[in-house]
């Protein structure tokens, strides 16, 4: 403020004082007084995606949109974010508007389903009111709305099957997001909206794909992720998973348009070990010679699947490689997962 006139400074201070009297302390401030604010993030459970997002995960206090075709992995990515938040002692909520949440699959991904707050609302208005109440509580760290396309306005549910309801859902989303944005920021909660894809009719040039729910979500979302299945992972004759690509089409907290590729294995979720191998090779931390993968003097295996299996059986080596990658990108270091509860359970089953 050195270049500002003293009279102007005095006038600003007086105006700020009046605003604080009227609206309360903290309603107006100088940005520099707070120091450089650190952008907190919740990991996605996928190393390459954390790197692509630029801050090590999805930003807290912001709205996130994940969209893509059917069976592309949208819910899987959202559930991994929930699991990562719970691992750090956070609370999570899931608004299941599609009435399709599989608790068995969620548990396999690492979600603590006993503590997960779940709601299966009847209407879009009800879903968004529940969302607002949970966010306003200040106790929820991650909230997932699955999905925007399933948020059906009350008028549509109460009306006849063939009735026209033009723009109802878009108006509902616009009104809800206007109310939610400030509350989400104050409560430091990550709100993830899962969305589907639709096609515009009669588009000759350009991309005909669009997302339902109007334009409001596109504006209010700080991060938008476009998720696509690009290949099938085969083992023998069977298909065991999908190769998935995520493009960060909008990012208000880091440079956008970065991409991440990873494996989503059936009944397992995102393959952490596969991701460590891929990023390790890309960053020359894991060496690839022909079909062999090695890390320093340690031979990880012949072929990618064998290297993945070695890292699964040797979590200390996997953690070491992961933390070297994280250091390179200035991301928070990963900690060793405590396996005591698993060991206790196996001991109990052996004794019984």
From Swiss-Prot:
InterPro entries: AAA+_ATPase, DNA_recomb/repair_RecA, DNA_recomb/repair_RecA_CS, P-loop_NTPase, RecA-like_C, RecA-like_N, RecA_ATP-bd, RecA_C_sf
SMART domains: AAA
GO BP terms, alphabetized: DNA recombination; DNA repair; SOS response
Molecular function (Gene Ontology), one example: single-stranded DNA binding
Swiss-Prot/TrEMBL keywords: ATP-binding, Cytoplasm, DNA damage, DNA recombination, DNA repair, DNA-binding, Nucleotide-binding, SOS response
GO cellular component: cytosol
A Pfam entry, by short name: RecA
Binding site for ATP: 68-75
Family: Belongs to the RecA family.
Annotated PANTHER family: MITOCHONDRIAL DNA REPAIR PROTEIN RECA HOMOLOG-RELATED (PTHR45900:SF1), RECA (PTHR45900)
Function according to Swiss-Prot or TrEMBL: Can catalyze the hydrolysis of ATP in the presence of single-stranded DNA, the ATP-dependent uptake of single-stranded DNA by duplex DNA, and the ATP-dependent hybridization of homologous single-stranded DNAs. It interacts with LexA causing its activation and leading to its autocatalytic cleavage.
Name of protein: Protein RecA
């Amino acid at each position: 403020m050195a270049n500002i006139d003293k009279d102007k400074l005095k006038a600003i201070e007086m105006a700020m004082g009046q605003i604080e009297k009227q609206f309360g302390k903290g309603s107006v401030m100088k940005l520099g007084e707070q120091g450089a604010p650190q952008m907190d993030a919740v990991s996605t459970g996928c190393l390459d995606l954390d790197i692509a997002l630029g801050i090590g995960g999805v930003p807290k206090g912001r709205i996130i949109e994940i969209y893509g075709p059917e069976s592309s992995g949208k819910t899987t990515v959202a559930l991994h974010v929930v699991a990562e938040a719970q691992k750090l002692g956070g609370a999570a909520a899931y608004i299941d508007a599609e009435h399709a949440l599989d608790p068995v699959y969620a548990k396999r991904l690492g979600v603590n389903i006993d503590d997960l707050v779940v709601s299966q609302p009847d209407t879009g208005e009800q879903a968004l009111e529940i969302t607002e109440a949970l966010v306003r509580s200040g106790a929820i760290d991650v909230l997932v709305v699955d999905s925007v396309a399933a948020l059906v306005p009350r008028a549509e549910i109460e009306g006849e099957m063939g009735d026209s309801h033009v723009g109802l859902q878009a108006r509902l989303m616009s009104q809800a997001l206007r109310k939610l944005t400030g509350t989400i920021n104050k409560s430091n909660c990550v709100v993830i909206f899962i969305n589907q894809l639709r096609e515009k009719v009669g588009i000759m040039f350009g991309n005909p794909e669009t997302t339902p729910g109007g334009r409001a979500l596109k504006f209010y979302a700080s991060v938008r992720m476009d998720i696509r299945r690009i290949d099938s992972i085969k083992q023998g004759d069977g298909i065991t998973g999908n190769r998935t690509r995520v493009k960060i089409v909008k990012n208000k907290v880091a440079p956008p348009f970065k991409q991440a590729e990873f494996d989503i294995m059936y009944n397992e979720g995102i393959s952490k070990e596969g991701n460590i191998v891929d990023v390790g090779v890309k960053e020359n931390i894991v060496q690839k010679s022909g079909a062999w993968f090695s890390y320093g003097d340690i031979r990880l295996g012949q072929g990618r699947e064998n290297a993945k299996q070695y890292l699964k059986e040797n979590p200390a080596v996997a953690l070491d490689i992961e933390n070297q990658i994280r250091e390179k990108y200035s991301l928070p270091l990963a900690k060793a997962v405590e396996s005591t509860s698993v060991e206790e359970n196996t001991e109990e089953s052996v004794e019984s």
